[in-house]
Amino acid sequence: MAKIPTDNHIRSMLDSVHPSHLQSSFDQVVAALREKGGMNEFQRLGGRALIALDGTEYFCSYKLGCPHCLTRKRSNGKTEFYHSMLAATIVAPGHNMAVPLMPEFIAKQDGAEKQDCERNAAKRWLTTHCERVKALRPVYLGVSGILCKRLP
């Protein structure tokens, strides 16, 4: 390979791809694991899958921002631009691997006055993906307390 694209170039190419187009890739991984018995290693509590839901930031800058960025004011008075997501992952105690599921991005929502948050992303994830993972008989783990209160 003569020219290797930079991470910024790859990001700019992928920015136009809606995340929903990636859903089938996540589904195919889980389906292949189930078909070949790979999910058996992740079953706990009588054959249930543990799905951890936790927020994480994957971009942060004082200089670069986009229309989808969330913002926060720091104590130094500067505005910080960032992107975050709710990661959903099949996990098992004592297992050194995890199976990622489709994330839910924490971003400005159309018509909303307040910024999006991890708790709202968890509600959206559960609404969107509950049926999809139902066969795994999931137990949801709210890593940072997002499931401490009952979600509708």
Where are these regions (language model features)?
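Electropositive, glycine- and tryptophan-enriched low-complexity nucleic-acid-binding patches
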Residues: K73-L136
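Short, conserved catalytic/metal-binding motifs centered on acidic residues
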Residues: T6, G47-F59, A88, A122, ...
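Short, basic, glycine/proline-bearing loop/turn elements
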Residues: S24-F26, K134-P138
